[in-house]
């Protein structure tokens, strides 16, 4: 998915959903129920990528 094609509001909505997913994944990790531990890394990196796009827009960097 190319995050730069989304609007800032859509990105913020997706970041919120991914943060909730990350919370649930960490909860599963703590209780020993997590089946795919690499998903935590994927979600964290997706959040970072989206926040980077939002920040680039704020300071006027175009990619």
Swiss-Prot record:
Signal peptide: none annotated. GO terms for biological process: translation. Belongs to the universal ribosomal protein uL29 family. This is Large ribosomal subunit protein uL29. GO terms for cellular component: cytosolic large ribosomal subunit. Keywords: Ribonucleoprotein, Ribosomal protein. InterPro entries: Ribosomal_protein_uL29, Ribosomal_uL29, Ribosomal_uL29_CS, Ribosomal_uL29_sf. It comes from Bacillus cereus (strain ATCC 14579 / DSM 31 / CCUG 7414 / JCM 2152 / NBRC 15305 / NCIMB 9373 / NCTC 2599 / NRRL B-3711). HAMAP family: Ribosomal_uL29 (MF_00374). GO terms for molecular function: structural constituent of ribosome.
